[in-house]
């Protein structure tokens, strides 16, 4: 059943107008000041640290996100913020899910699965890597795609009470 869900899952339909708005080539870094071009935002994302890096965490453009993810000063906490951001551009979330450094972090994977903008096929691939306690939370979460919730429900049921107690440290 689970294999069939993964093979037949398709990415959620996103509001095209919202994605177009988020992918504008120019956008202000803060609520004030002139809009920065995509090139300027990408250049700022390469800098080691600073206020601009914190502001860029809210930039949904996949090109900016890709550069941010490679920034050695970026912390897991900041990547979790990127993964949990809503609304989000699905392509940017895919970059987080596939990044060699960040895709192994349980907190990042959890944030991606709980983000309804994460493409279904990506969320299904990640949900099996989470804990039984997370599976129960995902199964009950509103706003997530039905295949993701069903997968978590099935995994949670198969885990049984003993494995769930182990996962939560009881």
What would you call each of these model-derived segments?
Residues 1-170:
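Alpha-helical scaffold segments
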């Amino acid at each position: 059943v689970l294999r069939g869900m993964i093979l037949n899952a398709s990415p959620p339909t996103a509001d095209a107008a919202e994605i177009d708005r988020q992918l504008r080539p120019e956008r202000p870094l803060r609520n004030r000041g002139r809009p920065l071009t995509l090139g300027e935002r990408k250049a700022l994302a390469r800098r080691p640290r600073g206020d601009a890096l914190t502001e860029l965490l809210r930039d949904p453009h996949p090109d900016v996100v890709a550069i941010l993810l490679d920034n050695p000063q970026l912390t897991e906490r900041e990547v979790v913020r990127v993964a949990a951001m809503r609304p989000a551009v699905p392509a940017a979330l895919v970059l987080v899910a596939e990044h060699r450094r960040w895709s192994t972090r349980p907190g990042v994977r959890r944030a991606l699965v709980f983000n309804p903008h994460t493409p279904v096929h990506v969320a299904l691939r990640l949900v099996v890597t989470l804990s039984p306690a997370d599976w129960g939370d995902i199964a009950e979460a509103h706003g997530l795609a039905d295949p993701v919730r069903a997968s978590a429900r099935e995994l949670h049921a198969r885990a049984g009470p003993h494995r769930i107690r182990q996962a939560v440290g009881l």
